[in-house]
């Protein structure tokens, strides 16, 4: 037979507490002064494992008149290893305090009543000692300003710097006892640069990615230092062997050679202008014969065809002007038509950056001319897993020099550099630089435009004997520096 036992005193007490919890009610204790809000803290570099090991101190602003500063509060926390500081003002303060409200509730388990108080959240950041931190007394007995910066010999200047940074939110203001302030950082830290101090912080608290980047940078630094040392020793050995004057002379000679790499063969001792830059060096006999069919339209061009070219903008203005003055003689007309066609091809070819495909200018170009353009006026590069023909800046200069020579042979060894420069999309300074390197005589001439205005053009003339060779502006500047 089962017996029914009455509950004991412990069970009665537990039921009373359960009933109280089930019927708990909360009581808001009103909006206190900002200086009396409860303090909630969070740590920026991790979670708190042993709350009992932390020693917290709360500091309130002593300025009760200024409404902006009277609510300023600073929370300091100490452990055996680190100190932490958090404040509710400046750029380091949490924005959530202004956007939302925090509360702390204290539950009385006996009465079932929870008292709710306003709270404020602080973000605690570690404060590193002995990292070259300047301590400046701002006023009062215990108010100081701490900031991470490079040590300054002049304490007054450092104070001005820190005050300006404090207004920008780059400093931390804390309240400390005079005995807790270390006036002089250790000697080993005084010799450290700001970069070294930042690297120490990354070593201690940086992420895996930051530490990996730091190790890579240090390894590269060691490698670059070794390389610089080796280069310096090699340079000293060469200077001791050859001498400074010989090295400067070699450098100037290299500059002169680099400057004429883009020029075609020049015969400076030629007796006639047509022999200085020979036509056969621009177009070989085989290439000249291959232009018979493509240049037929230019050879048979009429005034109506020229007007149509102008309307359709199918050819550049310099080519159209050359077509207007084709000679009547069949032999000379044929030669100039082929030269003008190749000049037009060079101008269109230079406007490109990368040649995609095997055809430089599309269909209709003779194979020998297409091969000439790709081999003589492009550089072979490797990009995105495939080879490409690139028209580099030096190749553009080479195309410009060949275009000038063709224009000289077409127009009795005088070329309108300004008109040709516009079609080549080139600056006047660069055009004159190339023309001078080709040893042309530069002159000015007024040219009448279609609307009646006059424009000053630069003309380049090839005449013998050739004027002295002139270096480019870049080489002249380099020679002056040497």
Swiss-Prot record:
Pfam families tied to this protein: RNA_pol_I_A49
Protein name per UniProt: DNA-directed RNA polymerase I subunit RPA49
Annotated family: Belongs to the eukaryotic RPA49/POLR1E RNA polymerase subunit family.
Post-translational modifications reported in the UniProt record: Acetylated at Lys-436 by CREBBP/CBP, leading to decreased RNA polymerase I transcription. In normal conditions, deacetylated by SIRT7, promoting the association of RNA polymerase I with the rDNA promoter region and coding region. In response to stress, SIRT7 is released from nucleoli leading to hyperacetylation of POLR1E/PAF53 and decreased association of RNA polymerase I with the rDNA promoter region.
Example GO biological process: RNA polymerase I preinitiation complex assembly
PANTHER family named among the record's database cross-references: DNA-DIRECTED RNA POLYMERASE I SUBUNIT RPA49
Superkingdom, natural source: Eukaryota
Keyword vocabulary terms for this entry: Acetylation, DNA-directed RNA polymerase, Nucleus, Phosphoprotein, Transcription
KW Nucleus (keyword) present: yes
Cellular localization per UniProt: Nucleus, Nucleolus
Complex and partners: Component of the RNA polymerase I (Pol I) complex consisting of 13 subunits: a ten-subunit catalytic core composed of POLR1A/RPA1, POLR1B/RPA2, POLR1C/RPAC1, POLR1D/RPAC2, POLR1H/RPA12, POLR2E/RPABC1, POLR2F/RPABC2, POLR2H/RPABC3, POLR2K/RPABC4 and POLR2L/RPABC5; a mobile stalk subunit POLR1F/RPA43 protruding from the core and additional subunits homologous to general transcription factors POLR1E/RPA49 and POLR1G/RPA34. Forms a heterodimer with POLR1G/RPA34. Interacts with POLR1G. Also binds UBTF/UBF. Interacts with PWP1.
